[in-house]
Swiss-Prot record:
It catalyses: a 3'-end 3'-phospho-ribonucleotide-RNA + ATP = a 3'-end 2',3'-cyclophospho-ribonucleotide-RNA + AMP + diphosphate. The gene is rtcA. This is RNA 3'-terminal phosphate cyclase. It comes from Pseudomonas aeruginosa (strain ATCC 15692 / DSM 22644 / CIP 104116 / JCM 14847 / LMG 12228 / 1C / PRS 101 / PAO1). ATP binds at residues 102, 283-287. Belongs to the RNA 3'-terminal cyclase family. Type 1 subfamily. The lineage of its organism: Bacteria, Pseudomonadati, Pseudomonadota, Gammaproteobacteria, Pseudomonadales. The keyword Nucleotide-binding applies. It is found in: Cytoplasm. HAMAP family: RTC.
Length: 341
């Protein structure tokens, strides 16, 4: 049966609209056309990371594609049948491996067999969730929703050099709903300063500022030296394990920004989330919406609604028979509720 074409304006939400639309087109079988891709960005059109996601999606479902080239502002994507397999995709820059993998996972979870996906590029990119976030925060929630995915970080890759690598093993699964009302009691905390080709005193200063801002003990703060050929790069990661969720926050060292400022950025993120009492921080909320919609139902609380979440909601409701509601919480925050349309 021929399915109706879904047409989208890609100017509002940047690459998020493209990635979500590709995931939904593959899983629903509905053909897609996006115009004005990243039209409001300083560098509009498809960048390497987006192009890798398009080509990878096309390979996995034998899609017919028009406009799959660097700088393209319009894309037509007509999916075929999803095929399990052993796949390898190279971004060719420090573009985010995490975002490419997130684009492909919904389809591979609906495939007819087990798949392996190896993606090379940036694993720790300031404009995307780091691999640690996927492994520690996002995937455990998807596993509670029925997904069967194992993720290995084979090699770190920072901006601008890239060279990182992820390996995912994906087995077919059925989605089930999940409700996340609050995080529950904190069980464990860990701060990690990653250094690749960067002096140790940078990480020491970052971790000292974490101690000052958050009061975390020596045992809760760790300096981690990576092989120099995986850099140069520096990331400060905070992980907070709670009864119902694991939260991950990250900030990146960069030229002209002090180690103390990097630590202030990530500590402020963590404090804001802890004080809110909500289950999902702003970035995790962005990433939970699509899998919950694929499950057909679910809910979570979050301190605020990002522009990414808002644009993602509009795309999802074009493809799937769901309603995504927003309930204001007393004292601030939002409850996002997904129901059948």
């Amino acid at each position: 049966m021929r399915k109706d074409l879904i047409e989208l304006d890609g100017s509002e939400g940047g690459g998020q609209i493209l990635r979500s639309a590709l995931s939904l087109s593959m899983t629903s079988g509905q053909p897609l056309r996006i115009r004005n891709i990243r039209g409001r960005r300083s560098r509009p059109g498809l960048l390497r990371q987006h192009l890798t996601a398009v080509r990878a999606a096309a390979e996995i479902c034998a899609a017919e594609v028009e406009g799959a080239e660097l700088g393209s502002r319009e894309l037509a994507f007509r999916p075929g049948a999803i095929r399990a397999g052993d796949y390898a995709f190279a971004i060719g820059s420090a573009g985010s491996c995490s975002l490419v993998l997130q684009t492909l996972l919904p389809a591979l979870l609906a495939a007819n067999g087990e798949s392996r996906v190896r993606i090379s590029g940036g694993t720790h990119n300031p404009l995307a969730p780091p691999a640690d976030f996927l492994r520690d925060s996002w995937l455990p929630l998807l596993q509670r929703m029925g997904a069967e995915v194992d993720l290995e970080l084979l090699r770190h890759g920072f901006v601008p050099a890239g060279g990182g690598e992820l390996l995912a093993r994906v087995r077919p699964a059925r989605w089930r709903p999940l409700q996340l009302e609050h995080p529950g009691a904190a069980l464990r905390r860990q701060a990690r300063a990653l250094l690749a080709g960067i002096p140790g005193h940078v990480g020491e200063r970052e971790l000292e500022r974490v101690r000052q801002r958050l009061g975390w003990s020596d045992e809760e703060r760790q300096l981690e030296f990576l092989a120099e050929d995986q850099g140069p790069g520096n990331a400060l990661l905070l992980r907070i394990d709670c009864e119902h969720i694991c939260a991950t926050f990250c900030a990146f060292g960069q030229a002209g920004v002090s180690a103390e400022r990097v630590a202030e950025q990530v500590a402020t993120q963590a404090i804001g989330w802890m004080e809110s009492g909500c289950a999902a921080d702003e970035h995790l909320a962005d990433q939970l919406l699509l899998p919950m919609a694929l499950a057909g139902a679910g809910s979570f609380t979050t301190p605020r609604l990002s522009a990414h979440l808002q644009s993602n909601r509009r795309v999802i409701e074009r493809f799937l028979p769901v309603r995504i509601g927003d309930q204001a919480l007393d004292g601030g925050g939002h409850r996002i509720v997904i129901t059948s349309a």
